[in-house]
Amino acid sequence: MRTQWPSPAKLNLFLYITGQRADGYHTLQTLFQFLDYGDTISIELRDDGDIRLLTPVEGVEHEDNLIVRAARLLMKTAADSGRLPTGSGANISIDKRLPMGGGLGGGSSNAATVLVALNHLWQCGLSMDELAEMGLTLGADVPVFVRGHAAFAEGVGEILTPVDPPEKWYLVAHPGVSIPTPVIFKDPELPRNTPKRSIETLLKCEFSNDCEVIARKRFREVDAVLSWLLEYAPSRLTGTGACVFAEFDTESEARQVLEQAPEWLNGFVAKGANLSPLHRAML
């Protein structure tokens, strides 16, 4: 029997870089919100203990794929604690809609969906805390997808406080370039000393993203899309890019702007969601 699981996108409604640790990782303050749009992961259980990804990603080795790594990590963790039923395995496939290097959290979301779904399907019984801790070893954004609620994040993104920002409508646009996260974080001109503020203060301020100035300067495609969107609505970069988003109060407003978009602008309209579509599917 094949089951399907949402793997939603996220937006960083704001992102501030507050410092850099000795190990090179950047400390930040950011606000995560999910979208009711994303990839779909299909899982069919096996009884021979094997993990197979039926939809490989070009240029990514099978065992290096975050989906496979997440499944193997859950398998090992559950087995080590005697909570993995004998023969547990899975065939996994993905209907990929989220771009790589887009700042929408696609890979992290995929890993989280696999952890949550297989924990349920294999009946391992691991807690959300355990799954989030495992997820952090796969990527800094994985825990927020595992926990499934919009959150204010600090540290390197692993210290999460659930929040409920307004669930607006967004026009999300992809400039047609992929921006690897290290390209932004290694840039010498990236602001790295934004003062820390309380979540209460930040929620009252105008939102912005410290990475945006670098993305616009280094990638003219990002600058072009943002310049166009800003004519219509408050707009900014998500994560380290490359995707940007404009926010609206209604779906019709967002769709009207998308209909006017030039041919070179690829985008979609989605609603913000404080409860992840993955967790909504589990209810």
From Swiss-Prot:
It catalyses: 4-CDP-2-C-methyl-D-erythritol + ATP = 4-CDP-2-C-methyl-D-erythritol 2-phosphate + ADP + H(+). One of its GO terms (biological process) is terpenoid biosynthetic process. The keyword Transferase applies. ATP binds at P99, M100, G101, G102, G103, L104, G105, G106, G107, S108, S109. Keywords: ATP-binding, Isoprene biosynthesis, Kinase, Nucleotide-binding, Transferase. Signal peptide: none annotated. InterPro entries: GHMP_kinase_C_dom (IPR013750), GHMP_kinase_C_sf (IPR036554), GHMP_kinase_N_dom (IPR006204), IspE (IPR004424), Ribosomal_Su5_D2-typ_SF (IPR020568), Ribsml_uS5_D2-typ_fold_subgr (IPR014721). GO terms for molecular function: 4-(cytidine 5'-diphospho)-2-C-methyl-D-erythritol kinase activity; ATP binding. The active site is at K10, D141. Pathway: Isoprenoid biosynthesis; isopentenyl diphosphate biosynthesis via DXP pathway; isopentenyl diphosphate from 1-deoxy-D-xylulose 5-phosphate: step 3/6. It is an enzyme of class 2 (transferase). The keyword Iron does not apply. Its EC number is 2.7.1.148. Belongs to the GHMP kinase family. IspE subfamily. NCBIfam families: ispE. Homodimer. HAMAP family: IspE. This is 4-diphosphocytidyl-2-C-methyl-D-erythritol kinase. It comes from Escherichia coli (strain K12).
